[in-house]
């Protein structure tokens, strides 16, 4: 027999159970703290590469020596469009919404107002997840693939800082040198990227191989020297703190957030980890990367004129007929770009 609702029995709706995953934004909120909405379609970044030249010694009677400028390059990016929307039809407003009492007496207009808030939250969550995915892609691969209906391109930041271990040098191999790798890589970041790395974010398999490594276990068990501490604990925003190494000085983290990939193979969508299983990311905890938003341009319904808005989010609603329906859409142009260099690595 079907589980029918008896409208004559006293009932109480305790709550609406929404089985939706939380929105995790660790990479976006931690590393891309320099948020800048632009008023233009494209975002240009001038890159000035410094060096470690020192001022020359000169004789007092000879005068100074010119320290020549290094010059700069300009990178130009066109932020991709993210434009999710939802549709509300008249028949949806005539029936009870999730969480509404059977005899609430809500009018269609009141339901429309409540549904608008719920729709915006859904659209905003989807856009936020895309921003987090873009932030991770930029740091891990140095590229952001823009794949969707009518678009297939790649934003390439020109990274030359990816390292791939091969054969028995891989973590878990017979010639693996995990602690030596981390020391060499932090030195490489300091030399080539002018950044002091203090964090290592490990993928799932990289984390397993790190803790299973005999040299790591031996170092952690050395009671005569404080070479580090393993003290795993959960942190907000889906992050797990694993412990600390003293040489090289690194805090170790894992980030288990996943995303739903329905564009690589639309016939077989899959849930994938944001951080590749074998990845090791070395990064500064305060890089101040930029989140640069392009301008949002649309036709204003009342005036019929084109309007450009300098914002990270544009929420708009408009009406269509035959059948009558209200469209609610969110528009954003969210790329990510850099103010200086850091070197993630892949093991």
Where are these regions (language model features)?
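Extended oligomerization regions of viral-like shell subunits
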Residues: 194-294
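Long, contiguous amphipathic alpha-helices that act as assembly "spine/axial" helices in icosahedral shell
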Residues: 82-160, 177, 181, 187-206, ...
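N-terminal alpha-helical "arm" segments
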Residues: 1-43, 341
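Short N-terminal edge-element motif at the start of the domain
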Residues: 165-183
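C-terminal structured domain segments
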Residues: 275-334
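Conserved small/polar residues in nucleotide/adenosyl-binding loops
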Residues: 339-345
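Assembly/oligomerization interface modules of large self-assembling protein complexes
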Residues: 33-102
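Basic/polar low-complexity intrinsically disordered segments
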Residues: 31-56, 262, 280-281, 316-317, ...
